[in-house]
Amino acid sequence: MTAGAKKLSLGVLLALGFIDLGRGGFHWLAPDSGAGVVAGMNLSFPNARDVVFLLALNGISQIFWGIAYLFIVFRARQLVRLALLMEVVRGSMVLATEYLLKPPVSPVPGRFMHMATTIVCGGVLLLCMLPSGKQHR
């Protein structure tokens, strides 16, 4: 991995760590988990609390992804490529679900973030796979 790719990959994971902490904290702590306020979902139906609950659970998961990414950046840099690969796979699965398998009725507020994160992490992962030039042939 080149020095530039290493810095870029650490920067991307650092940013994703803080984004996931913020986004996850919001979903977990907001009274409606962001369903009504951010996504504009109708929460007047009887099982609306289930939607709020599921978004809060997703927020908890995002918090732990954020912690994991920050741990990798500061303590376990040997896992950077694995973290980027996992983010690309996760993002691809989210996009496949969102656009092909189970499209939602209303637009997902984070849909462009899903695309951008998947593309950026995929590009950085490819850069990380390039040889550093220090290898002997």
Identify the function of each model-found stretch.
Residues M1-R23:
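Cytosolic juxtamembrane helix and N-cap/initiation of the first transmembrane helix
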Residues G17-G36:
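Transmembrane alpha-helix/helix-exit interface in multi-pass inner-membrane proteins
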Residues V38-N42, P104-A116:
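Non-cytosolic membrane-interface motifs at loop->transmembrane helix junctions
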Residues G40, S44-L70:
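Core segments of alpha-helical transmembrane spans in multipass integral membrane proteins
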Residues G66-L82:
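Juxtamembrane helix-break-helix junctions at the cytosolic face
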Residues L82-Y99:
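Hydrophobic alpha-helical membrane segments
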Residues I119-R137:
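Membrane-water interface at the C-terminal end of transmembrane alpha helices
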